[in-house]
């Protein structure tokens, strides 16, 4: 009798009609005050919940009115856990006659990419080699120790100070790549451990904020090189990027700076100032304004440790100048590496591409070598990292041949270049965009 009762209840549940929606209806809900998105053909109303989203409301809001299936899988290593948060937000499904993809996205590419992801999972490419990351942390701590010993043993003369600064800049750059790993949840299986170590590395070892980084970087991954969605291409009118923006600025007669010379003043404004001035100020203000007291405590612990270590050698003012010189050196390293993969690629308004195509359009690789891997924190495999952001970086080279094959199958360009050419392409790209601006400014 109990069994029969259960069957009756199940039949009754199946009779309840699930609301269905067309893409035309879903795409209307793409406002800040009205947000729907689709995951695996199920429709969710995330309007209110997006404020609570751990990755920030902007990154999830960028997919309002769209299919977010591949982005959802890319960012979340534990789908079962995060799926629990989706259940209360479910409002219906795509109508049976509707395609799974919005805006005419290529369903065949999407299908093949999902098969590729399944292959990567079967190859255990999302499994971490913890010794690898322990060695990375150890070599950062070793660099910090060498820096202190240099000034302790040889004194605070110019040569020991310069050597110490370069060693500390190296440790800061490497800590930057390491925090990137933990921030992407690519080291531990449980997100909470990644979050904890992320705060330690970016906070105590670098004096920055995990929440600030998450807010910016996840948007970049979700919509790379898309104006108004990727904060990394918001240049605050200092540079014009790609082809669309310089022409628009030119047509509107916008001339905040002489953009036809941006490939020249880049050397004065870009690499030297990004971290010591813009990022350092923005990070501190973000933590205070948004009351990220935990992040602020971690960051303060870095500054306390630094000044306790180096004030005895340089005094208060000297230690402060020393710190900013280290930031100055690190900033050059950071800017050149992070821009060589993206600034030279297509930068445009939203084109509503599938996940695979959108990442390949916005990213390129640099050839593999031991030095290139170390120097860039394996961001020379930027394509694979963008496709699989939770994949441990030591496995990115293993999936690269399969990504190349998929690109060849669908006629998508897979760009890979030598390191020096990748760096020079940054300047070529800025020069090209500057010329487009000048032409539009004078003639359109």
Curated annotation (Swiss-Prot):
> Motif Histidine box-3 located where?
382-386
**Membrane topology per record:** Multi-pass membrane protein
Q: What subcellular locations does the record give?
A: Endoplasmic reticulum membrane
Cytoplasmic side residue ranges read: 1-131, 179-264, 327-444
Q: Top enzyme class of this protein?
A: oxidoreductase
Q: In which tissues is it expressed?
A: Expressed in a wide array of tissues, highest expression is found in liver followed by brain, lung, heart, and retina. A lower level is found in breast tumor when compared with normal tissues; lowest levels were found in patients with poor prognostic index.
Task: Name the pathway it acts in.
Answer: Lipid metabolism; polyunsaturated fatty acid biosynthesis
According to UniProt, the name of this protein is Acyl-CoA 6-desaturase
Q: Which UniProt keywords apply?
A: Electron transport, Endoplasmic reticulum, Fatty acid biosynthesis, Fatty acid metabolism, Lipid biosynthesis, Lipid metabolism, Membrane, Oxidoreductase, Transmembrane, Transmembrane helix, Transport
Which comment does the entry carry about domains?
The protein sequence includes a number of characteristic features of microsomal fatty acid desaturases including the three histidine boxes HXXXH, HXXHH, and QXXHH (these domains may contain the active site and/or be involved in metal ion binding), and the N-terminal cytochrome b5 domain containing the heme-binding motif, HPGG, similar to that of other fatty acid desaturases.
> Which organism does this record belong to?
Homo sapiens (Human)
Q: Which GO terms describe its biological process?
A: alpha-linolenic acid metabolic process; arachidonate metabolite production involved in inflammatory response; fatty acid derivative biosynthetic process; linoleic acid metabolic process; lipid metabolic process; long-chain fatty acid biosynthetic process; positive regulation of cellular response to oxidative stress; unsaturated fatty acid biosynthetic process
Write out the coiled-coil annotation as residue ranges.
none
Primary residence: endoplasmic reticulum
Give the induction note: Repressed by dietary highly unsaturated fatty acids.
- Record's function text: Involved in the biosynthesis of highly unsaturated fatty acids (HUFA) from the essential polyunsaturated fatty acids (PUFA) linoleic acid (LA) (18:2n-6) and alpha-linolenic acid (ALA) (18:3n-3) precursors, acting as a fatty acyl-coenzyme A (CoA) desaturase that introduces a cis double bond at carbon 6 of the fatty acyl chain. Catalyzes the first and rate limiting step in this pathway which is the desaturation of LA (18:2n-6) and ALA (18:3n-3) into gamma-linoleate (GLA) (18:3n-6) and stearidonate (18:4n-3), respectively.
Q: Which reaction does it catalyse?
A: (9Z,12Z)-octadecadienoyl-CoA + 2 Fe(II)-[cytochrome b5] + O2 + 2 H(+) = (6Z,9Z,12Z)-octadecatrienoyl-CoA + 2 Fe(III)-[cytochrome b5] + 2 H2O; (9Z,12Z,15Z)-octadecatrienoyl-CoA + 2 Fe(II)-[cytochrome b5] + O2 + 2 H(+) = (6Z,9Z,12Z,15Z)-octadecatetraenoyl-CoA + 2 Fe(III)-[cytochrome b5] + 2 H2O; hexadecanoyl-CoA + 2 Fe(II)-[cytochrome b5] + O2 + 2 H(+) = (6Z)-hexadecenoyl-CoA + 2 Fe(III)-[cytochrome b5] + 2 H2O; (9Z,12Z,15Z,18Z,21Z)-tetracosapentaenoyl-CoA + 2 Fe(II)-[cytochrome b5] + O2 + 2 H(+) = (6Z,9Z,12Z,15Z,18Z,21Z)-tetracosahexaenoyl-CoA + 2 Fe(III)-[cytochrome b5] + 2 H2O
Residues assigned to the Lumenal compartment are 153-157, 286-305
